[in-house]
């Protein structure tokens, strides 16, 4: 009963996480991206799996959380789930957000995980050189869908748009000024901050390639699938372009 938090004055960990997710979901499409929501949801599910694995419970009261809980959680993520340190670091940050919330709301007298830190060990991220980007642009691809994904990648490279921003980009977000130059005027999916980006020749060429599908509000790039499936498609692009590594859509921005 102590783990389950019996009593009206007990707040539960996953209960609080679920409330946070519900609030986050309401902001998706406004100042939050669905991909960020999905990231939090997956971390929540890892935590639920750990509670079942280690304690055989569906939830746990904040007042029952001690230092060894988070230490065991790190071991579980590494040994059972096979996560790397960067992903573990991200998962622990989400857990610590919940305990900090509990502390700030007065549900517990102190944050049990304050000062706990997992050092991420990221591998060096590769970026495309000018010649590699040109190879991607010139690659002969096997099908239309892979071509769309390649074009979206190149468009991001010449505009600095993120995956979330290019997915939601519509023809209505692109304006032509008095000089005949085209600009993207939109808001960042993740932060809600307005931005303006002038279309350089390559980006404008790609826009022209797809603008014949124009209808009010229609997306510029008819992308399907998730961030993960797009990156899987880019692996095929990399192979046809003769690249020595597999770029992700994030690489396009740098």
Which sequence ranges carry the predicted segments?
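A Lys/Arg-rich helix-loop hairpin that forms a DNA/phosphate-binding surface
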Residues: 5-15, 35-38, 51-75, 222, ...
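Short, aromatic/basic-rich helix-turn unit that serves as a nucleic-acid recognition element
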Residues: 8-45
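N-terminal DNA-binding recognition helix of tyrosine site-specific recombinases/integrases
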Residues: 35, 46-53, 60, 68-71, ...
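Short basic/aromatic active-site micro-motif
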Residues: 65-68, 90, 148-152, 224-228, ...
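Basic, Lys/Arg- and aromatic-enriched nucleic-acid-binding interface segment
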Residues: 85, 89-91, 108, 112-163, ...
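Conserved tyrosine-mediated DNA breakage-rejoining catalytic core shared by Y-recombinases
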Residues: 123-126, 132, 159, 168-208
